[in-house]
Curated annotation (Swiss-Prot):
The gene is def. SUPFAM superfamilies: Peptide deformylase. It is an enzyme of class 3 (hydrolase). This is Peptide deformylase. One of its GO terms (molecular function) is metal ion binding. Fe cation binds at residues 88, 130, 134. Belongs to the polypeptide deformylase family. Its cofactor is Fe(2+). It catalyses: N-terminal N-formyl-L-methionyl-[peptide] + H2O = N-terminal L-methionyl-[peptide] + formate. PANTHER family: PEPTIDE DEFORMYLASE.
Length: 159
């Protein structure tokens, strides 16, 4: 496994739409493993492949309930509304309140190619939406309702 360089805001790759994964092979598995290692090293809760310069629909997330690896994730259902703080490993030091669904259902492939669905609520719903937005070339700052100052940031981790 290897630590990947996290692309920062201003890098054009962050604004490009990622392409679907058509074959799950050892290269894709290595990318997922590298992404997870990179996310953990940087104390994040999620990372999309384009954040490490790879335009493929790959996401890793860990909101404290174990690592999720999602290949070709898509939101198939959303419900409710929540407004909460977000940050991003690609936009260090910037945080803001973003409106997201309270609950989402996401369909994806696992590393064996099996179709799976996961229902996420609260922080997991927020992380899923944030990372899937990345795959569309959308950053959380595009959706910020209000930027947060240092006094309001206690306990906020970068997604």
């Amino acid at each position: 496994m290897a630590i990947r360089y996290i692309r920062k805001i201003g890098d054009p790759v962050l604004r490009k739409k990622a392409k679907p994964v058509t074959e799950i092979n050892s290269h894709i598995i290595t990318i997922l493993e590298d992404m997870a290692e990179t996310m953990y090293l940087n104390d994040g809760v999620g990372l999309a492949a384009n954040q490490v310069g790879i335009l493929r629909r790959l996401v890793v997330i860990d909101v404290g309930e174990g690592l999720l690896e999602l290949i070709n994730p898509e939101i198939v259902y959303e419900e409710g509304e929540q407004i909460g703080p977000e940050g991003c490993l690609s936009i260090p030091g910037v945080f803001g309140e973003v409106k997201r669904p309270q609950k989402v259902k996401v369909r994806y492939l696992d590393r064996e190619g099996n179709v799976k669905e996961i229902v996420g609520e609260d922080l997991l719903a927020r992380a899923l939406c944030h990372e899937i937005d990345h795959l569309e070339g959308v950053l959380f700052v595009d959706k910020v309702i209000r930027f947060l100052d240092k006094e309001e940031l206690e306990g906020v981790k970068e997604v």
